[in-house]
């Protein structure tokens, strides 16, 4: 699984280094961080709607869009995917208590 995510991220980085005129990825880079963040917000909202509709197929599709746009943000910020994967590895297996987390007041 990690390999396909790595390939996606590498493709995004390649588009950043070597733009293609008709590339949606390059469109996002050309519009900048605010556009990328807006798309992440839109895609997260679509995940929520798909989940509320109990539409598993749509949840999967929208999650892929979230991953993609988050990867574009990482590339925009020059944050290597390896940094994120290392954080996942460090968090994996750690015990977490509900009391350790801040209460969510509003949505």
Curated annotation (Swiss-Prot):
Main location: cytoplasm
GO terms, biological process: L-histidine biosynthetic process
Involved pathway(s): Amino-acid biosynthesis; L-histidine biosynthesis; L-histidine from 5-phospho-alpha-D-ribose 1-diphosphate: step 2/9
Catalytic reaction list: 1-(5-phospho-beta-D-ribosyl)-ATP + H2O = 1-(5-phospho-beta-D-ribosyl)-5'-AMP + diphosphate + H(+)
One Pfam family, short name: PRA-PH
InterPro entries xrefs: HisE (IPR008179), PRib-ATP_PPHydrolase-like (IPR021130)
Keywords linked to the UniProt accession: Amino-acid biosynthesis, ATP-binding, Cytoplasm, Histidine biosynthesis, Hydrolase, Nucleotide-binding
Annotated compartments: Cytoplasm
GO MF annotations, alphabetized: ATP binding; phosphoribosyl-ATP diphosphatase activity
GO annotation, cellular component aspect: cytoplasm
Entry EC no(s): 3.6.1.31
Similarity comment: Belongs to the PRA-PH family.
Name of the protein: Phosphoribosyl-ATP pyrophosphatase
Species this protein is from: Bacillus mycoides (strain KBAB4) (Bacillus weihenstephanensis)
Organism taxonomic ancestry: Bacteria, Bacillati, Bacillota, Bacilli, Bacillales
């Amino acid at each position: 699984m990690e390999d396909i995510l790595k390939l996606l991220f590498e493709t995004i980085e390649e588009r950043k280094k070597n733009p293609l005129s008709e590339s949606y990825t390059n469109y996002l880079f050309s519009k900048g961080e605010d556009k990328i963040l807006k798309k992440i917000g839109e895609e997260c909202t679509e995940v929520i709607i798909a989940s509320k509709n109990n539409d598993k197929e749509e949840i999967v599709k929208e999650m892929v869009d979230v991953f993609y746009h988050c990867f574009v943000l990482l590339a925009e910020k020059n944050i290597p995917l390896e940094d994120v994967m290392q954080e996942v590895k460090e968090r994996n297996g750690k015990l977490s208590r509900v009391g350790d987390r801040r209460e969510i007041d509003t949505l």
